[in-house]
Amino acid sequence: MIMDYEAILNDIKPTSDEKRHIDDVSSDIMNFLQNACNSRGIDAKVTLVGSVAKNTALKGKSDIDIFIAFPLETKKEYLKEKGLELAHLCCREFDVDAEHHFASHPYVTTHIEGCEVDIVPCYAIKNGSELKSAVDRTILHTRYVKQNLTESQEDEVLLLKRFMAMTGTYGSEFKVGGFAGYLCELLIIYYGNFEET
């Protein structure tokens, strides 16, 4: 049986309108947060990470992950305090509620213009040896994938994610215990395409 990958991609690839909306919302949030950092004298850089940044998000699953990267010498308490302060400022600006979560340190999840948004403080590391918390590596992961995944391979990642979702093996959450999106991207970078993976 021959698979019609184009038909599958039409079902799982975000439309140009969806991509444009996600890009616009992401830009608005990032600009607000970076301006808030600058106007308050907070030394931090706002960065888009995750599948939206890597162009590997499935249709309807375009969660926006925005990291606020603080210098390595920043004290952890300051990072937590200012990270949450900036996230709450953003929620007030967009008139939305903030949900608190905890990974290596607190972060905020909210919904802005129909998009789920995570605002996460982290440390700006240049390599894995500087890792201070688990979330710090996310920026490095995003950078690696963007540098190594070709445009045509982005579709291959979508096919792999969909296949894994259909078999119940996609999702790194505890209840699923499956493959993370980052692992799907690494597999496509290594093997080249969905069929070889």
Regions found by a protein language model. Name each.
Residues D28-G41, E85-F94, F163:
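Generic non-transmembrane alpha-helical segments
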Residues Y5-N10, S62-D65, D136-R137, L160-M164:
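Short amphipathic alpha-helical segments, especially helix-boundary/capping motifs
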Residues M1-K61, L72-Y78, V108, C122-A124:
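N-terminal regions immediately upstream of nucleotidyltransferase
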Residues L48-V49, T56-T138:
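Well-ordered mid-protein domain cores that form the structural environment of catalytic cofactors
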